Amino acid sequence: MNLNLIKAGNNIPSDIYVIIEISSNSSPIKYEVDKQSGVLFVDRFIPTPMFYPCNYGYINETLSLDGDPLDVLVPSPYPIQSNVVINCKPVGILKMHDESGNDAKIIAVPNDKVSKEYENINDISDISELLKKQISHFFQYYKTLEKEKWVEIIGWGDHHEAKLEIKNSYDRAKKNTSLK
């Protein structure tokens, strides 16, 4: 399976494909897909005993400011296994910094064709306050026990900000590819 062949979506930035690396509620293990081979590697064991509150993945053909593809969190009724692609719509963004710089997280829910459960969720304001608190709490503290690692939560942005971040990351990747 070559995940590099997966496009960013059907209608960037409103209709995206998210490649899942980590299932929701999974153990504190940070997995990362090697972008060259498409193989899922263990990046590290997270010493803080916390689990991911949502499925965690990325949008192919994007380049965020930290030099990696754009990170995405996908709430779903069930955990989605790693190395699976899900069609989503972006609804918001968690703006944050870590030891490597800007590290935004897009919040995207399954597309209406994938799940009717999310058809009325179109903006971060439609996401429950509890889930938003769980997400920000996780990212605020999951690196606490790792030396020289830290996170600063800046705040939430709406679906317009999320789509702008996706578009900018997509354009950045296209520009970066054309420079090579």
From Swiss-Prot:
Pfam families: Pyrophosphatase (PF00719). The keyword Cytoplasm applies. Transmembrane segments: none annotated. GO terms for biological process: phosphate-containing compound metabolic process. Keywords: Cytoplasm, Hydrolase, Magnesium, Metal-binding. It catalyses: diphosphate + H2O = 2 phosphate + H(+). It is an enzyme of class 3 (hydrolase). One of its GO terms (molecular function) is magnesium ion binding. InterPro entries: Pyrophosphatase (IPR008162), Pyrophosphatase_sf (IPR036649). The keyword Hydrolase applies. Its main location: cytoplasm. Its cofactor is Mg(2+). Mg(2+) 2 binds at D71. Catalyzes the hydrolysis of inorganic pyrophosphate (PPi) forming two phosphate ions. HAMAP family: Inorganic_PPase. Homohexamer. Belongs to the PPase family. This is Inorganic pyrophosphatase. It comes from Buchnera aphidicola subsp. Schizaphis graminum (strain Sg).
